[in-house]
Amino acid sequence: MAETQNFDKVNILKRRSIPYDEYFGDMDLTPKQKAKRKEMAIILEDVFYIFFEMFGKGLEIGFLNELKVKQELTYQLYDAIENSKEAERFFETEEQKDKYITDTVNETYRSTVENIVREPDTLDYTGTEKYWLSGDRAQFIAENESNTLLNSAEFIEAKEEGYTHKIWMSYGDDRVRLTHQEVDGAKIPIGAYFDVGRARMLYPKDVTSELSTGAECPEEVCNCRCTVSYVK
């Protein structure tokens, strides 16, 4: 689910996204893991920007075809995910994939409408684009969703390779949420859930696993930079 939307707050002329090399580069990940996240984020950024362009054109002509723009975003997300090199590892079941895409489409549309109505004049950091339909927002969503998908893929891969435990690792700076600091260093069985604030997650940004409550707790998921180390 595009959990970034529920936590989508911005100040006028303040950049919300972070350049991919910086966003992923500072995480406790291998160079290969960082490269995969950046590659997927670039693809997803185009997907969300196409959606914003369609949305904006609908507003310009005074007719926003909800069904059409949702169908296009759905198609683009399926295409991006299914053509990824990691496609087979993003989700454990087809049902998980379908739910993730449906939730992402519905939440992206809902939040865009809601924010445009509430704050129609909010600009992006360049002062030239309406933030809610901007490249900045597309990048912000893309970097978050890429991290969500690759975290899931790495969890599934770790299980397949026989890892038995996992350790939650926070980013370690003064921006880390208190609830994430509290779970930092916790080592649990690979199939167990971390309790992070109100959220129950298998790994950082888990919004798709069967018993996860991450999708209902955007304050624990949005822009999370934590990682997990898998051990045997």
Predicted regions: what is each one?
Residues 136-232:
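Acidic, glycine-rich two-metal-ion catalytic cores of nucleic acid-processing enzymes
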